[in-house]
């Protein structure tokens, strides 16, 4: 019985952790993961990306997360208006019970220019998804073989919406700002019958700008604020981007920077853009009280994004801050 209670306590802690959505330190490596309205905020006709996160590597079985996403332009009209769709798949798991969640999401975004020049664009996005969380009871050691779990898997739907604004003041200054709400329907994620444990709504505000300070170097400040239930997160920092070569689809650049997750971690970022490819790397170092248990080891992230281009000038969007 004692062992059974210990396992249930572990699951309860997992549910509490699940009460906070999957998120990444690379806040804009693949922005549709953050806000469905960002679908379509790129140059080209489509985009494919993936991000992998390994968290708390100092423990025996660390928390691992993988996200894969794809986007494509459905329609583009006059004045840079258009419609874009996206699909995202998440998977994360950890622990000896292989507790994890798998989810799939479909999004659609419409973007409308606010002026004739197309230097100010408003985008609205909607997203729907389905998730399944569960664990492997065969990995549990029970003192009483007759004891068993009544619920091993929970399934639920997810709804999200967002709005984003892109603004280009001049050739060397542009920015984007977005707001999104996830888990609008607050699904029940409890493993216990006759119990309601809801996945709380997550509110996110994000801003990224790019200032061309020198001929080949830009400064990119960023701010991300998120709130979910009793939890809040504030990330702020800046990158420096060095344009090694600028020749249309053959653009080559390096980007490095630091960000701070307030009262929690320092995040080091490194990105390389080579033509249509973007390769990303980041590392979290704990600075909170958790650093005692984790040995200061936070999380490693690696990712890749590929942008599909058509070669036609008619399909080229205004130059957004690259991710």
Task: List PLM regions with ranges.
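NAD-dependent ADP-ribosyltransferases
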Residues: 1
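Subset of outer-membrane beta-barrel
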Residues: 20-323
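Sec-dependent N-terminal signal peptides
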Residues: 4-15
